[in-house]
Amino acid sequence: MFISKILINKLIFYIENQWDVHNSKPIINIYHLYSDILPKHFIDILNKKISHCIINYLNKNYHFIFSKNEKTEKDLKIHLWIHPLLDILSLDSLADILRFIEQKIENSIKTWNINNSDESQLLINLLSPWTKLFGEEFWKNLYKKFFSPKIHEMFSELYLDVHEKIENIHCIKLIFELKENKIIPSKKCTKIIKNDFIEKLNFFIKNFMKKNKNNYNCDKNKDIIIWYSNIINYFKTKKNLYEDIKNSLNDCLILLNINENII
């Protein structure tokens, strides 16, 4: 027991004063070397010290503030040095870290400017490594509480232009990136496209045709037909989604008085 106390004190000193949290290997090596030698309550102490060091570091350095100048590559990719420790930490220590990360994730989404493409990409890079760890229910709740209001507001402010390709529209790109990274559920993505984008598209086409009703053969009308055909072709590449939104897209075709079978 005396030797165990000396050893644990040395390990604690190393963890608190010498360990670089970005390097999980020494801690993993210590765990595998001593977990079968030291009594369980000493291992529990080590777990708490490791967890405490990680949380202290995150508190000081990891705020999800959207300024690239304030972040190092290590900070942006904290999953690279936290995930390897998940298998060796006790449930209590792990819970403390994950609760902290959950809070940071929520804070990051709260302060996220959804219309800023750089911030959006940074957010995706930060969140995507944690999707499997936190589970489907966590992300559903996040969607309802934070993502949904921001997304609806973003689409409400969307300005459509027949000269802008759909694949270049920020909110469309963002929705599919969030879906592909499993940050928002697939069903929510479909609902957003139908209820936010296609409804806006429908309204835009109605107004466009109303303004140009006496000039059907003008270049503007040709432009919108080409533009809309490209929109359909774009959604056809999203196979599962396309089947769900096909009828809604067809409603817009009727507005355009297009007889061609482009859908």
What are these regions (language model features)?
Residues 1-263:
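Extended alpha-helical scaffold/tether regions of large eukaryotic proteins
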